[in-house]
């Protein structure tokens, strides 16, 4: 029997490998046990899915199992972004949401996310409890459970209208529509396809969307992750001239990638910092910022400038979300391009993130390169890069021993001033850092670096790879 483990955001596995109808049914049954134990079963469960291969059928399996267990299901009648489905937890006052999605993973993967009644990522405590519930289930066939489904408890619903109403209350959509922007959208064949063009229609602003159709193979891209190497087509289209900005969404639209007016990718660290500056400077909001450890030190500097607290947490919204809610932060986010905002859900929302960036442009009348210069003028230059390296599981202990070597005092000849282990290992240098951690969603070792000079960033990453012999 498969040992189901939840990472930084849900359980993910290879389709037809470990991600089977039997294991999805086990997840659903374990979730029912959890909801009953928490007194949430009577509130019902939102169930939705993304555009991946068999996602709709997997979601139907979840709905069937939950109805067989006597739990009402609000089943999405179409593929939908994770933040849209998460918001519907609040709209329906449900006990949570089960979402079939592998987010940004390659096409051969799928996943199972659980969003509790507060509409954010499940905490470590919740996922530990869920894992135990699943592990204790007796072995039984999917058919034996589904045969007992109660179709009267499955209510089909369109999750989009409540979400769009919420977005319209947060963002000045008329301002964006009347700004006359020329916006390029890359939906990466994911569940966010069509949302931004629909939201922004009916004004002077024009929208060109690519990869907006459903294609679970994600052709032409390595994976539906909005980072530079996967955005070559939108970048080349924008480079022809006339564009104002590019907005890319990942596979389930909870993350965003921004391209400037020249089609150049804006790092997610800069995007996070620019959006935070917008909220603090233009919208005059005050409150804490919550960041993952691999986010920019520019945020700490903004906190000093505007007199707000900055909290650092391990990577993953299962860690960031609770602190975001606890301190009523104005914004929370992480290096992956996932950002949450006060007044919405304590969860990443790529669509809202993109709209806030467009609102920033419409408010100031400035293009992305100028907005980035605003940030640099305020807190100085910051350069960043990340490398993802596949590794053999058998090599993990060797890598860990090298990372934790107490005698390590330089990387690429650059003195290490200090280190922390909030998540993986982060080495602090003068006005910068290098972080090394294992991904919580994929078999990858991630290296991150930030400094005030691009050459220093490159040297840190090259030096780390040489030291780790990877």
Task: Label each residue range with its predicted role.
Residues 1-69, 95-96, 149-183:
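An N-terminal, well-structured beta->alpha segment
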Residues 245, 281, 285-470:
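Phosphate-binding and adjacent anionic-ligand microenvironments
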Residues 33, 41-109, 198-259:
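N-terminal small/polar loop signature for handling phosphorylated ligands or for N-terminal nucleophile
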Residues 9, 47, 85, 98, ...:
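Buried hydrophobic positions in well-ordered alpha/beta secondary-structure cores of metabolic enzymes
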Residues 1, 110-241:
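Gly/Ser/Thr-enriched, mixed-charge loops and adjacent short helices
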């Amino acid at each position: 029997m498969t040992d189901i483990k939840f990472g930084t955001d849900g359980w993910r596995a290879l389709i037809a490998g470990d991600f089977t109808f039997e294991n999805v049914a086990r997840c659903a049954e374990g979730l029912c046990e959890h909801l009953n134990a928490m007194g949430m079963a009577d509130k019902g469960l939102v169930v939705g899915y993304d555009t991946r291969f068999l996602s709709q059928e997997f979601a139907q399996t979840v709905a069937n199992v939950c109805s067989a267990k006597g739990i009402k299901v609000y089943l999405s009648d179409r593929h939908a972004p994770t933040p849209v489905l998460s918001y519907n937890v609040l709209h329906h006052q449900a006990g949570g949401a089960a979402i079939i999605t592998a987010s940004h993973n390659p096409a051969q993967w799928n996943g199972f996310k659980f969003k509790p009644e507060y509409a954010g990522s499940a905490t470590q405590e919740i996922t530990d409890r869920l894992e135990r519930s699943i592990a204790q289930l007796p072995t039984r066939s999917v058919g034996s459970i589904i045969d007992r489904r109660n179709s009267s408890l499955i209510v089909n619903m369109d999750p989009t209208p409540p979400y769009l109403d919420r977005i319209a209350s947060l963002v000045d959509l008329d301002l964006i529509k009347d700004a006359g922007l020329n916006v390029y959208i890359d939906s990466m064949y994911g569940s966010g396809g069509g949302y931004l063009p629909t939201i922004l229609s009916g004004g002077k602003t024009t929208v060109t969307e690519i990869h907006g159709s459903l294609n679970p193979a994600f052709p032409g891209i390595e994976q539906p992750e909005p980072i530079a190497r996967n955005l070559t087509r939108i970048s080349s289209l924008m480079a022809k001239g006339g564009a104002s900005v590019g907005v890319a969404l990942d596979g389930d639209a909870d993350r965003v990638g921004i391209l400037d007016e020249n089609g150049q990718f804006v790092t997610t660290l800069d995007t996070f910092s620019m959006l935070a500056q917008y909220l603090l400077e233009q919208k005059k909001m005050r409150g804490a910022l919550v960041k993952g450890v691999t986010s920019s030190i520019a945020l700490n500097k903004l906190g000093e400038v505007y007199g707000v607290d900055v909290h650092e947490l391990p990577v993953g919204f299962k860690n960031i979300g609770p602190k975001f809610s606890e301190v009523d932060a104005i914004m929370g986010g992480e290096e992956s391009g996932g950002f949450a905002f006060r007044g919405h859900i304590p969860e990443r929302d790529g669509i809202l993130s993109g709209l806030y960036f467009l609102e920033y442009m419409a408010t100031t009348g400035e293009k992305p390169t100028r907005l980035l210069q605003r940030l640099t003028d305020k807190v100085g230059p910051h350069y960043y890069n990340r490398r993802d390296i596949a590794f053999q599981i058998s090599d993990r202990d060797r890598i860990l021993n090298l990372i934790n070597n107490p005698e390590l005092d330089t990387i690429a000849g650059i003195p290490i001033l200090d280190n922390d282990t909030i998540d993986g290992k982060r080495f602090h240098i003068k006005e910068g850092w290098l972080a090394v951690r294992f991904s919580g969603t994929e078999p990858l070792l991630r290296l991150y670096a930030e400094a005030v000079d691009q050459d220093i960033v490159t040297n840190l990453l090259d030096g780390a790879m040489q030291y780790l012999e990877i």
